[in-house]
Amino acid sequence: MKIKLLLISFILAANALGAVAQVSKTYFVSKPGTLISMMTEDEANSITHLTLTGKINAEDFRHLRDEFPNLKVLDISNADIKMYTGKAGTYPNGKLCVYMPNFIPTYAFSNIVDGVTKGKATLEKIILSEKIKNIEDAAFKGCENLKICQIRKKTAPNLLPEALADSITAIFVPLGSSDEYRYKNRWEKFAFIEGEPVETTLQVGAMGKLEEEILKSGLQPRDIN
């Protein structure tokens, strides 16, 4: 039986002011390390949902971590991660480091500030490629709002210490592959759901009923986990 997870954002009318509007962008990166040069600072600041294709490296991950202040959803499922050697990657304090191809870099979305590891607080969902080999140390450590990690790969990539945030609610994996993940080292504590997540945003007014809004969206309350 295919299990689906429905993610619902409740936008109460009384609290609608001040919410960040969804801004979705897709970029093809032809040369690794050049993502940030493809947009203005204002564009980078406004993006909430970002899809990347082409070639990226640890420099691009550093920019994604440090220069996209409203980034919530990142899809790199069709991007190739290229090797990078240098000081402009994700490792804290500009340490010289070798970043291997198709590895999610160490400290990809976390950093050490005053001796404390802090994750990217805005990040809620990440979609990873079927080519991923490793998720490196502390890649998503401290990403307190990261709830969904979707991986296109049928065999579990190597998961290094503290690579994923404890806040993750579910790991979405391809159909028939949950056991492959469940029995791999360091993956044991996560919940796995096969297939694609189903997402919707519901606006419920002060007098509105949640069940009615769910039905209006074309879904059934029983589909919600």
Q: Which residues fall in each region the model found?
A:
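Structural signature of tandem-repeat unit edges
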Residues: 23-31, 48-56, 71-87, 91-103, ...
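Acidic Gly/Asp/Thr-rich repetitive segments characteristic of extracellular carbohydrate-active
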Residues: 27-46, 201-221
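Bacterial Sec-dependent N-terminal signal peptides
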Residues: 1-24
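Short, aromatic/basic amphipathic alpha-helical patches
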Residues: 63-66, 161-164, 179-190
